[in-house]
Structures are given as C-alpha cells and as structure tokens.
Amino acid sequence: MEYRDKPSVAGGAQASFLGSAVRRRGVLTGAASLASLATMAPVAYAQEASRAGLQRPSEPFPKRGGSLRIGFGVTTAHFDLTQGGSASALCHMYNGLVRYNLSDGLRTIVPDLSSAWEISSDQLQYTFMLRSGVKFHDGVVFSADDVVASFQRIIAPPEGIVSVNKGIFSAVDKVEALDSMTVRFTLKAPRAYFMDLLADPANIVYSKKVLDENKGDLKKVMAPGTGAFQFKEHRPAERWIMERNPNYWDAELPYLDQIELIHVPAWTDRGTGVLSGQLDMSWNISRETWDEGAKRKAQFGANRLGNYGCYAVMFNTKRGPLADPRVRRAIHLAVSRQDMITAFETQEMINLTRWIPYGNPLATPSDEISRLPGYRANKKDDIAEAKKLMAEAGYANGIKGLDFCVASVAAHAEILGPAFQDQLKQTLNIDCNIRITERALQIEDEQKGNFDIVLDTPGHTMGDLAVIGNAVFRTGASRNYGGYSNATLDGLLTQYEAATTLDERAQVASQAQDALDADPPWFLVGYTFHLLMWRNALKGLAFDYRAFSQWGRVETAWIDS
C-alpha cells in the first residue's frame, strides 16, 4: 500500500491511495472520497495541489495580507504539546508527518512533512519519505532525526516527561530513521486507524536539537516549529499573535500576514464578537448567537459539526468514596442526563450518547440508549437502585465534602457544574464543594490526581473504541487521570483490537460498553456538536462542508476584503 506523488499521463500530479481505506468519522477517504468530492465544484480547484501534498484554498484567486482574528479560550498550561499544551493555540506553528486536508473539509489525509508513504502488505510497517528543503523557524534543517526524537518522546517519554498520547500509540514497536529523509514506524499489530493518529494536530514534530538542549521538557520553551506561522507575541489569558513565516517550505502559503488568537472564554461573547465584526471566526459559540448568525446568510457562515469531545464528570477512583464501584454506578444511575442536557442547551448541543459516540457505526442507537438504566428519562427505578448501592457501600446517608474541580469557563462554572452538584444532592444526598480552577491549569490538577470529581471535556482523535479506551480507560493509560482499572474492560479492549470483522468488533464493543456502564470511570453527560461561525469575508477553509470539528491549522485562510 502506498501514497506516492507521481506524474500522471497528462503530466500533472497524481496521488495513489492504494488499499489504504482509511475511515474518518464514518467518511471514506482515498479514491472513494475523492470521487465523491468531484461533485463539489468549489473543491476542484484545490484537489490537484492536495494530491501533490500541498494545501490550497477551495476558492480560486486568493488574496494576500491581513490578520485573521479567532476567538476562543486560548489559554494553555504550558508550551509543550506532547505534555498536554493546548493544540488549538499552538498547532499553527508546527507540522506533523501528515494532516487532514483543509480543502475537502478534512475528509482525506494528505502529506505534511512527509512527501509520500508506503504501508507494508501486513500493515505493520509505515515508511515515510520526508519533504526536502524544510527548516525550523530558527534556521535548523529538518531531518528524520527530528521525527524519531519527537515520536520516541510520545511513545516512550523520558523520566519526568508526561506524554498525554502515549496510550494511543501503544501499538508502535519502534520508530527509526532509515536515512536522513526516510522514517519507518513498525507496529506490534495492525491498526487501521494509525494514519488518523498521525494526522492529529497535537502529534507534531519538534526539533531534536531543541529537545536535547532542554532535556526533553518544553513546557517553558516556545520551541521553534516548521509551520506556516511563527511566534510573535503571547499575553497570557489575553491573546496570541503569530506572524507569517516568510521561509515556509510551501512558498505559496500562508496568505495572511498574521493570526490573532483572542481569549474569549464565554461562548456568548465569542458569538457576539463574530456578529459585531470584532472577530472573524470562532470554533464554538453559544446556541443563541449561532442561531442569529445562521439567519444572516449574507454576512455569516454557520455550521454544526460533529465532535468527538464530550462532557463528563471524571471520578478519582484512587481515593475516598469514588474508589468503590458501587458509588460510581449509583451516580451513573441517579443523575438525569436529560436534565443536564436541557440545562446546557442554550450553550452547547449535547447528545444522549454512550461510550462510543455517534459517527462511529458501532455506536448504540439513540432510541436504544433512551431505554437503558442510567440513560432513560424516568429515573424512579434508577434512583431506587442507586440508593440500594449507596447503602451497600456504607453511604446510606450520603457523602459529605467531595472536592468538585470545575474550570473557570462560565458555562461550566455557572451552569453545568452547579446542575450536577444539585442532582447529586437531590438524588443521593452527596454534598460536593465546587472548586473553580483556571481552564488551562485544570489538566495539571488532573495529572496530579488533585480532585475527587472533575468536570471536563475529554476529546479524542477519532470515535474508535480502541483509541478512546487506550487513551483514557485502560489500566495505566496516559490520560487515565482518575486511576481507573477494570481487568474485564482491559481484556475486551485487547479482543476488540484483534477482531478482524465488523461483526466481531460490534459484539466486543457492546460488551465493553456494558462493562463501562456497570463500573463507570466517569459520569458521561454526552458527546457534543460544535457550533462554528465565521464572517463570509473569510475564505479558504471549506468550513461550509467540513466533516467534523477540529480546532486546528488555518494556513490556507484568506480575507476577501
């Protein structure tokens, strides 16, 4: 199997996706999706460039200059993406080996720092030919050594370094440089989703020189990247400014002079900022401002995007009452998801979902979910069973003084957190004290286990059970901050990855979801939609037919002023 740029009979660029059959959020990539995209006229302009491993806007005749103003919560705990720094803020300065294609709405995977790749027939070896002429922002020439150093740090981080994506790369046996411009990944077992992992904006390539100089720890270092934009200014909790990289390896890009990432934590303020012209776009805004923008089609674009992020209250299973699975199961049963979703509906659209989100063919249908204990609207029997479990665990009279960590995002601290707090008190007499923490610093509390319960928005690279499970649910997983351990689930995840047919995977996935319901690591509120809005003057990002929500790079953007 291969992806290789080669001349076509007509002399143009032709990309071959031979047998790759990569799937992303239920959308076929490769030849099948390229054929379907031929019906989308605006995309045709950019297809040849994308196939050659270059990103181009879907509209012809892009204009140069100007600044793109993006509003969202742009804070980050530190500057190291591998250790959990904010990819949505930092990714613009970096590249990965591959990426999702901006010109077709993120439906296909195309080269980034690679120029071509080959996949062995047994799907155990992925060999990447690297792009020549690439330099980091400090002038250091990019090579295979940088790729090996970056991914080795993800897969087997040195002592004292936290790799948040270590778990999802657990199938990688080794990564090696075959020569200065060729890298090979060898897997322990085939993983159909491996290219999707590499395309995640967080899995970027750092300079080996900078990693070595800082002993692998870049938390306090604004490390030079290879990306289309380079660092200019950062005012914490206010804004980032990144300016055009004049030496970017793709000389056509970027069109913008700079991008401004403006810290707007409140979703209503983000939407109002776009509507008033103070912002050019926001990745996720409040429902009421999105509805207003959707009505004003001459001025604004709006899209509701499927998202593999969810709202969940994570349990610290290593201490106190939440160490008892009966208490966790009681909360799973007693709290009304319907009430939580309704309380939040003016802010964000949350779906009634189980542990596999919609968009994955193995997700439980909504009508079936609505009849399950814990998920059904009628809570009478669920609360009775929950109280029985609490009594068996020794908490018939409730629990006092749980530490409930909630981010300083207004909708979390003022709506969803208090709604969950009230439900615990009313149904099970569980008292918890809400502790507000800065959103960017919340991950550090989680990594240290400094919580009893924590409201967060865990996101995943894709909707596959193996990716989700290996990142957050498997014993010892790199993002399993609550210390959850379930031998039954671990075994099912291993079975799931070894399954070779859809029927086998469906059977094991169903058993895994049942195991999570019986012994939940979280209270899962539900997976969400993101409400994207932009001014119509913003071009080049194919927002109107984007396949899913990704708060990622924007180098093909241009302003039609």
Which role does the model predict for each range below?
Residues 33-34, 43, 52, 88, ...:
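Detector for C-terminal structural segments
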Residues 72-89, 113, 140, 194-203, ...:
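A structural "hinge/loop" feature
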Residues 75, 99-104, 199-260, 268, ...:
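Gly/Pro-rich hinge or "lid" segments in bacterial periplasmic/extracellular proteins
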Residues 69, 143-150, 180-186, 227-228, ...:
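Alpha-helical secondary-structure segments
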Residues 247-292, 329:
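Ligand-site clamp/hinge motif
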Residues 129, 164-211:
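Surface-exposed binding/hinge segments that line
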Residues 71-121, 152, 222-226:
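N-terminal lobe/hinge region of extracytoplasmic solute-binding protein
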Residues 1-22, 33-36:
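N-terminal secretory signal peptides
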